[in-house]
Amino acid sequence: MADMKWAVAHIKSSFNNTIITVTDITGAETIAKSSGGMVVKAARDESSPYTAMQMAGQLADQLKDKGINGIHIRVRAPGGNKQRSPGPGAQAAIRAFARAGIRIGRIEDVTPVPHDGTRPKGGRRV
């Protein structure tokens, strides 16, 4: 446990795309990042679980090259007035990190939740 080197994986998953950014433990320095468009070319496939697995596998290889063997995961959905549940790529990415041999510390949901923010879109319902 003393020789573990940790990083933080920020997974932003919507129903249109999945973006994974890996930073150092403070969140200041970006170590590696990937998005759906970097893996597949069709826009309809950017948010798919398969694409998220490919991205996580590539990032796991980059992390191993840099000597990082453990990550904490922060999952984020669009939030605010939008969808509060993460897209299909989030769970697939977490599984792919684990399958690639990266140790997972904490999994945290950091979706922004409004404390009665702006008015939601759509007409008035009576």
UniProtKB/Swiss-Prot annotation:
SUPFAM superfamilies: Translational machinery components
Gene3D superfamilies xrefs: Ribosomal protein S11
Superkingdom of origin organism: Archaea
Species assigned in the record: Methanosarcina acetivorans (strain ATCC 35395 / DSM 2834 / JCM 12185 / C2A)
Subunit structure: Part of the 30S ribosomal subunit.
Pfam families: Ribosomal_S11 (PF00411)
Family: Belongs to the universal ribosomal protein uS11 family.
Signal peptide annotation: none
Single GO term (MF): rRNA binding
Keywords linked to the UniProt accession: Ribonucleoprotein, Ribosomal protein, RNA-binding, rRNA-binding
Annotated protein name in UniProt: Small ribosomal subunit protein uS11
Lineage of origin: Archaea, Methanobacteriati, Methanobacteriota, Stenosarchaea group, Methanomicrobia
GO biological process per UniProt: translation
